[in-house]
Amino acid sequence: MSIRIGILGYGNLGRGVECAIRQNPDMELVAVFTRRNPEDVTILTETAAVCNIADAADWKDKIDVMILCGGSATDLPVQTPEYAKMFNVVDSFDTHAKIPEHFANVDAAAKKGGHIGIISVGWDPGMFSLNRLYANVVLPEGKDYTFWGKGVSQGHSDAVRRIAGVKDAKQYTI
C-alpha cells in the first residue's frame, strides 16, 4: 500500500515535490491542486488528477498527506491551518520570526481535525537546521557557517510579486 499524496500549488516547489514523489515507490501522487485553470496545467504523473484548489475538500478521504507548496509570505499562514483541518499536512514555512505563531495556528487546526501538521520542512528551517543541531551536538564548541549570499531569493521574490500593482519581480541579494 502506498502513501497517497496531494500537492497544493504547482510552481517550482510543487514540480520539485512531484519529481521527488516519482522516485519513491511507496508514494503515489493522486492529485495536484492549483489556483490556475486545471486544464492549463500539465504535470508529469499521468495517473494523477489536476484540480482547482476549491475542490480539495472533496479529496479528504482520498489523500493521506497534502504537501503545501505555497509561499511563506501570504499562502502558508492561511492555507496550512485551513487544510490541516482536512488532511495531514506538510509545509515549508520559512519566516523564522513567525514560526511559533504559525506552529500554534497549525497545531490547533490539526488537532481540531484529528490530523498531523508538520511545518517548516525545507532547507532552512528544516534540513539545514537539523544539520546544524547535529553538528553542535558533536562539536559543541564549533562555529556555524552558512552559505547565504548572492543570488535570487525565491521567497523574497514571491513576497514582492504579491504587492498590489507589481506584475513581476525578482529579489537579488548582492
Regions found by a protein language model. Give the residues of each.
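NAD(P)-binding Rossmann-fold cofactor-contacting core
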Residues: 23-44
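Rossmann-fold NAD(P) dinucleotide-binding segment
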Residues: 56-61, 65, 73-92
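Short acidic-hydrophobic, aromatic-tinged amphipathic segments that line or gate anion-handling sites
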Residues: 49-56
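Gly/Ser/Thr-rich loops at beta-strand to alpha-helix junctions
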Residues: 11-13, 96-99, 120-129, 151-153
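General beta-strand structural signal in soluble alpha/beta enzymes
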Residues: 91-92, 117-121, 147, 170-171
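Rossmann-fold NAD(P)-binding glycine/threonine-rich loop
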Residues: 93-117
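Active-site-lining helix/loop region of Rossmann-like oxidoreductase modules
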Residues: 3-8, 12-17, 134-174
